[in-house]
Design a protein with these regions (language model features):
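Conserved AAA+ ATPase core "coupling" helix
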Residues: 176-184
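Ser/Thr-centered flexible coil motifs
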Residues: 1, 83, 175, 189-191
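Conserved H-loop
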Residues: 150-154, 162
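Short glycine-/small-residue-rich flexible loop motifs, especially phosphate/cofactor-binding loops
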Residues: 133, 160, 180
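A short beta-strand-to-loop transition that corresponds to the Sensor-1 phosphate-sensing loop
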Residues: 146-150, 173-176
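A short helix-turn-beta junction within AAA+ P-loop NTPase domains corresponding to the substrate/partner-engaging
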Residues: 158-171
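P-loop NTPase motor domains
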Residues: 1-141, 145, 154-157, 197-202, ...
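Phosphate/diphosphate-binding loops
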Residues: 184-200
Length: 207
C-alpha cells in the first residue's frame, strides 16, 4: 500500500494521472520515487534500498528516461559487461520495454533472448518470459530463447511450459551430464540422444 501510494504521488508530480493524456509529458525517474518514499511514514527502508540505483554505481543505467528507439530493423541490447548483480534487472527492464512497444505498435518482429537462464533464475523473470511466450503470436511477435544449459533453464517451473509453447526447438551438442534431462524433456530416441552427444562443434555434420 505504501509503494502504491508513492507511485501515485510520483506520477502526480509530473502531472500524470490515469485519466490524463500524458503522451507529451516527461515521465518520472527512480530518484523522483525515492524522494517521495523518503517523505512517507514506513517507507524509509525502501528509499534507502533505492539509493544505490539513483545515486550509486547503477544510477547511469536506471535513473534516467528510456532513450532507446525500437524503429530500426535490428536493435541489440548487450548486458555482457554489466555487473552480475545488475544483469537480471537490466534484462527484465529491456524485455519490459520491448514488450510495451510490441503491444503499442503491432507489426512483425522477432525477439531473441540470449542466455535466457539468467532471467529464469528469478520468479518474476521466468513468469514474465512465459507470459511473452504465450501471448507473443497475438502481437505478431516471434520469441526465441537461447540457453547453453538446459538444466539451468528447467530449474524454473516455468522452463518446461516455455519449451512447450515453442513451435521450433533446436538442440546443439549436449554434455553427458545434461543429456538425460534433454532426452526426457524433448522425448528423444536413444539414437537422437547419442547423436547429440557425438555431434561436432561448429562443423557441418556431412563433412
Amino acid at each position: 500500500a505504501v509503494l502504491d501510494e508513492a507511485l501515485i504521488q510520483t506520477y502526480a508530480i509530473k502531472d500524470i494521472t490515469p485519466d490524463s493524456d500524458f503522451s507529451s509529458k516527461t515521465p518520472p525517474v527512480l530518484s523522483d520515487l525515492q524522494n517521495i518514499l523518503e517523505g512517507l511514514t514506513g517507507a524509509e527502508s525502501m528509499a534507502i534500498r533505492l539509493k544505490k540505483y539513483t545515486t550509486g554505481t547503477f544510477a547511469g543505467f536506471l535513473n534516467m528516461p528510456t532513450n532507446v528507439p525500437l524503429d530500426n530493423n535490428l536493435v541489440v541490447f548487450s548486458i555482457r559487461d554489466m555487473e552480475e548483480e545488475l544483469r537480471p534487472i537490466a534484462m527484465y527492464s529491456i524485455l519490459n520495454h520491448v514488450w510495451t512497444s510490441v503491444r503499442r505498435v503491432q507489426k512483425k518482429r522477432l525477439l531473441i533472448v540470449d542466455e535466457a537462464w539468467w532471467l529464469m533464475k528469478y520468479d518474476i523473470g521466468s513468469e514474465f518470459l512465459l507470459n511473452i511466450a504465450k501471448r507473443a503470436r497475438k502481437y505478431y511477435l516471434g520469441l526465441t530463447t537461447i540457453s547453453q544449459d538446459v538444466q539451468d533453464f528447467l530449474a524454473s517451473p516455468k522452463g518446461r511450459p516455455i519449451i512447450t509453447n515453442s513451435s521450433i526447438q533446436v538442440l546443439m551438442k549436449q554434455s553427458p551430464a545434461a543429456i538425460d534431462v534433454v532426452q526426457q524433456t524433448f522425448n528423444l530416441t536413444d539414437a537422437e540422444k547419442y547423436y547429440l552427444l557425438e555431434a561436432r562443434v561448429g562443423l557441418n555434420q556431412s563433412q
